[in-house]
Swiss-Prot record:
GO terms for molecular function: glycerol-3-phosphate dehydrogenase [NAD(P)+] activity; NAD binding. Catalyzes the reduction of the glycolytic intermediate dihydroxyacetone phosphate (DHAP) to sn-glycerol 3-phosphate (G3P), the key precursor for phospholipid synthesis. Its EC number is 1.1.1.94. Keywords: Cytoplasm, Lipid biosynthesis, Lipid metabolism, NAD, NADP, Nucleotide-binding, Oxidoreductase, Phospholipid biosynthesis, Phospholipid metabolism. This is Glycerol-3-phosphate dehydrogenase [NAD(P)+]. The lineage of its organism: Bacteria, Pseudomonadati, Pseudomonadota, Betaproteobacteria, Burkholderiales. HAMAP family: NAD_Glyc3P_dehydrog. It comes from Acidovorax ebreus (strain TPSY). GO terms for cellular component: cytosol. NADPH binds at W11, R33, K105, A137, R252, V276, E278. GO terms for biological process: carbohydrate metabolic process; glycerol-3-phosphate biosynthetic process; glycerol-3-phosphate catabolic process; glycerophospholipid metabolic process; phospholipid biosynthetic process. PANTHER family: GLYCEROL-3-PHOSPHATE DEHYDROGENASE, GLYCEROL-3-PHOSPHATE DEHYDROGENASE [NAD(+)] 2, CHLOROPLASTIC. Sn-glycerol 3-phosphate binds at K105, G133, S135, K188, D241, S251, R252, N253. Pathway: Membrane lipid metabolism; glycerophospholipid metabolism. The active site is at K188 (proton acceptor).
Length: 330
């Protein structure tokens, strides 16, 4: 099976390593936008910038240049770029015959569209889906046990992802609910900022549990309003990804919350990370999409107010705690 992974960041590299390591019959091409970066990775057999010290398996090769030509000869194409770059990538892949799956999580800034909605706009002929779930790149690359979800309305896409990645260290489940999986991936990043803030302010385990639970309710309400299945949010791409991103210190979104709790500005927090924290860029869009369908998301609203400088860290908590009493709704 020939697998092409577009994007040589931490996550794209990790999945390329995973695919090449667990099946010797796989030929894996990792595409890097920068030709010098590609040459350096191919020569040194590692990604020193994002996953230093992790050697590439023999079946993994690094390329650059014409990505559409590379994809044209693939059995599966995986797009490992951030949400902001997805539209441009899909436009260049329009007409590709191979199944295509993206890894990004969030709603598109400006349009508020989910990834599959962007694909329907710019490349409707593609057989596409999303590969998501509770997974840190470092742990996937080092073959620590992980479970993920391959979601697509097309069985060909789901089956290709299972064939490419299911192995001793990575269990892949299939789902038809691409809406639910994408909503879970977008909202959990925003909620992880809130949980990081909570932990940074040392508000205790009770507060953390409340935030995660009520955050899951917000995620579910939005997902149902957009056509998702309720059971998806109890699975890997919902509750699973939320728990990991909200509590794991490898989470960039959680670290944004921790840094804001220390009194850093948003610009300082983002600069100190050195990598993209999708929740910072998708929070406003999540709230806008929720308002458009009449869904109340008070935690996400407070995160947006914090990121926009309308609230300070302690004020964010006070706003949530001072809301009027109500019945517990999911």
């Amino acid at each position: 099976m020939k697998i092409v992974v577009l994007g040589a960041g931490a996550w794209g590299t990790a999945l390329a390593i995973s695919a090449a390591a667990h099946a010797a019959c796989h030929e894996v091409q990792l595409w890097a936008r920068d030709a010098q970066q590609a040459q350096a990775m191919q020569a040194k057999r590692q990604n020193q910038r994002y996953l230093p010290g992790l050697a590439f398996p023999p079946g993994l090769h690094v390329a650059s240049g014409d990505m559409a030509a590379l994809a044209a000869d693939a059995d599966l194409v995986v797009v490992g770029t951030p949400m902001a770059a997805l539209r441009g990538m899909l436009e260049r892949l329009d007409g590709c015959a191979a199944p295509i799956a993206w890894l990004c999580k969030g709603f598109e800034a400006g349009t508020g569209l989910m990834a599959h909605e962007v694909c329907a706009q710019v490349a409707p002929r593609l057989h596409s889906g999303v590969f998501s779930g509770p997974s840190f790149a470092q742990e996937v690359a080092t073959a620590q046990p992980t479970a993920m979800v391959a979601a697509s309305p097309r069985a060909t896409v789901r089956d290709a992802l299972v064939q490419a990645f299911h192995g001793p260290a990575l269990r892949v489940y299939a789902s038809e609910d691409i809406v639910g999986v994408e909503v879970g991936g977008a909202v959990k990043n925003v909620l992880a900022i809130a949980t990081g803030l909570c932990d940074g302010l040392q508000l205790g385990m009770n507060a953390r549990a409340a935030l995660i639970t009520r955050g899951l309710a917000e995620m579910t309400r939005l997902g149902l309003a957009l056509g998702a299945r309720p059971e998806t949010f109890m699975g890997l791409s919902g509750l699973g990804d939320l728990v990991l991103t909200a509590t794991g210190d490898l989470s960039r979104n959680r670290r944004v919350g921790l840094l804001l709790a220390e009194g850093r500005t948003l610009a300082q927090a983002v600069e100190s990370l050195g990598h993209v924290a999708e929740g910072v860029y998708s929070a406003r869009t999540v709230v806008q999409r929720a308002r458009a369908v009449g869904v109340e998301m008070p935690i996400a609203e407070c995160v947006v107010a914090l990121l926009d400088g309308e609230l300070r860290a302690a004020e964010t908590v006070a706003r949530l705690m001072e809301r009027e009493p109500t019945v517990e709704r999911h």
